UniProtKB/Swiss-Prot annotation:
Phylogenetic placement of the source organism: Bacteria, Bacillati, Chloroflexota, Chloroflexia, Chloroflexales
Disulphide bridges: none
Protein's cellular compartments: Cytoplasm
Gene expressing this chain: aspS
Provenance organism: Roseiflexus sp. (strain RS-1)
Protein name: Aspartate--tRNA(Asp/Asn) ligase
Biological role: Aspartyl-tRNA synthetase with relaxed tRNA specificity since it is able to aspartylate not only its cognate tRNA(Asp) but also tRNA(Asn). Reaction proceeds in two steps: L-aspartate is first activated by ATP to form Asp-AMP and then transferred to the acceptor end of tRNA(Asp/Asn).
């Protein structure tokens, strides 16, 4: 036996007992005849006292030990002197006086600090991830993730869901991002794909009669990486039969309300979760995933300046654009240099420029970038519409609607952060519903599915599919949390004729549809029930609940933003023999 107790287990009731502990040297303090070692495992820390008078052999072991050595210690639990109590650790009332000690494994000096945050480059942390994971913060994050996943499993089991594993090697079908392809040795020239999601498989499980399915699913997407994306990620994959949109939203709301109250009880959340239509979210916030912990809503002044002769307004409005603004409370004290930095931020977001005005106090003059181009009445009308108060900074964008939305969304997030408007102890869950079914791809001159090609159109919009596809709304919904998309789902198409109509709209000809999705089309002819589902992202939700800023901090072994595993050096070249067995020749053009 290596240990009788963990390093976080001993309390006052253990005083007088002989115990056997094993763990890592967290800290070591040498006072000559007395050496103090904080012994650590994932459960906590216990202070070990090595006294040369009581046990010279154990003292000699402690004398040679260094940080991160793996030690086994036998000793007696003793109450600490009252002045030596440590309220910061659970074992702070006791210490163990060592009688025996064994070095189970020495350790080189670690390239990063384990017993404190060292501020190292992330590349170093990822290269030595097995050391980084020893840190208290990382152990806390991984344990939080475990508790979240366990809670989800237990909750869904009580709700009658069945956990079913779906294949990792599947057929390659277009789902938006690039597939990771796996060559088949047994079938030369053919490939499997790693699943971007179990979407088609879970729908087929509904056809099979498993009316409540879930899976903690590993998913893979070969896409350009962003701060909150990984090439492989984990989602809670769910599907239900004989449900409508309200049924899906209800169970997810109950799940995450209960989860947050259990796992992060110190955080506040509003229930029921607010519901915004896609059109409303874009109109009010310029985003389909707004952070609802603060206001800063967009204000449309297009009608206010409709008769203006100002060229910037005219150029936008005469070509179907918008003039919208954002009121930043108290930011009128910004210097010209600071305002110029905000203007540059708007340009980086895609805007041609950014108009600004500072609301004056009573009797004062408006300081602005466009005061000479508009009349005093027009300026006053803009300030009234935007509810400007003295000292406010008004920011205005005049551009096509898409540019206006993405620019003001970027500025809204920027000032939300600058003004500390987002309370970290608030969880602003919400739903965004009624997404468009399709969007026009200008570059390829065709319609693309906004979510995926199995999303059902709203019944009342079916008649528009042939005449005005851009106005067709989908039975789709996104779960958002603190400005992130936490999950997406929809009611699915379950009839072959409707599925074929959508394929036709997306420009997928009948032959291609049968080749890529024939298994789905055929299954729909064997009594497919109405069904729908959702796939919340485990990594993203864990990140937010852990108060981290990237999902890499809640994943045990993440990759870099360039999709590289610095610890194992993956991806890596393979032997020529392996390539020959797979009938593959490389052409590195």
């Amino acid at each position: 036996m290596y240990r009788s107790h963990t390093c976080g287990e001993l309390r006052a009731e253990h005083i007088g007992q002989e115990v056997l502990l094993a763990g890592w040297v967290h800290r070591r303090r040498d006072h000559g005849p007395l050496i103090f070692i904080d012994l650590r495992d994932r459960y906590g820390i216990t202070q070990i006292v090595f006294d040369s008078a009581d046990s010279p052999v154990a003292h000699a072991v402690a004398s040679d030990a260094r940080v991160e050595y793996v030690l086994q210690v036998r000793g007696r639990v003793v109450q600490r002197p009252e002045e030596a109590y440590n309220p910061d650790i659970a074992t702070g009332m006791i210490e163990v006086h060592a009688t025996e000690a064994t070095v189970l494994n020495p350790a080189k000096t670690p390239p990063l600090y384990i017993n404190k945050e060292g501020g190292e480059e992330e590349t170093l942390r990822l290269k030595y991830r097995y050391l980084d994971l020893r840190r208290e913060r990382m152990q806390r994050n991984i344990m939080l993730r475990h508790r979240i996943v366990k809670f989800i499993r237990d909750f869904l089991d009580r709700e009658g869901f069945v956990e079913i594993e779906t294949p990792i090697l599947i057929k390659s079908t277009p789902e938006g991002a690039r597939d990771y392809l796996v060559p088949s040795r047994l079938h030369p020239g053919k490939f499997y794909a790693l699943p971007q999601s179990p979407q088609q498989l879970k729908q087929l499980l509904m056809v099979a009669g498993f009316d409540r399915y879930f899976q903690i699913a590993r998913c893979f997407r070969d896409e350009d990486q962003r701060a909150d994306r990984q090439p492989e990620f984990t989602q809670l994959d769910m599907e239900m039969s004989f449900v409508d949109q309200g049924d899906v939203l209800d169970i997810i709301e109950r799940l995450f309300t209960a989860l947050c109250r259990e796992i992060v009880p110190h955080k506040r959340l509003v229930t029921p979760f607010p519901r915004l239509t896609y059109a409303e979210a874009m109109e009010r916030f310029g985003s389909d995933k707004p952070d609802l912990r603060y206001g800063l809503e967009l204000v449309d002044v297009s009608d206010v300046v409709a008769a203006s002769s100002f060229g910037v307004f005219r150029a936008a409005l005469d070509t179907g654009g918008q003039v919208k603004g954002l009121r930043i409370p108290g930011a009128g004290s910004y210097s010209r240099k600071q305002i110029d930095e905000v203007v540059e931020l708007a340009k980086q977001a895609g805007a041609r420029g950014l108009l600004w005005a500072v609301v004056p106090g009573e009797g004062g003059e408006v300081r602005s970038s466009f005061g000479r181009q508009v009349s005093p009445d027009e300026m006053a009308a803009i300030i009234r519409r935007m509810e400007g108060a003295p000292g406010d900074l008004l920011l205005i964008v005049a551009d096509p609607p898409k540019i206006v939305a993405q620019t003001l969304d970027r500025l809204r997030r920027e000032f939300g952060a600058r003004l500390n408007l987002a309370d970290p102890n608030v969880l602003a869950w919400a739903w965004v519903i009624d997404f468009p079914l399709v969007e026009w791809n200008e570059e390829e001159q065709r319609w693309d599915a906004v979510h995926h090609p199995f999303t059902a159109p709203k019944d009342e919009d079916l008649h528009l599919m042939d005449t005005d596809p851009g106005r067709v709304r989908a039975k789709a919904y996104d779960l958002i949390l603190n400005g992130y998309e936490a999950g997406g789902g929809s009611i699915r198409i379950h009839r072959r004729d409707v599925q074929q109509r959508l394929f036709d709209l997306l420009g997928i000809d009948r032959e291609t549809a049968m080749r890529q999705f024939g298994h789905m089309l055929e299954a729909f002819e064997y009594g497919a029930p109405p069904h729908g589902g959702i796939a919340p992202g485990i990594d993203r939700i864990c990140m937010i609940l852990a108060d981290e800023v990237t999902i890499r901090e809640v994943m045990a072994f993440p990759k870099t933003q360039q999709a590289v595993d610095l610890m194992t050096n993956a991806p890596s070249p393979v032997d020529e023999r392996q390539l020959r067995e797979l009938h593959i020749a490389l052409r590195l053009d």
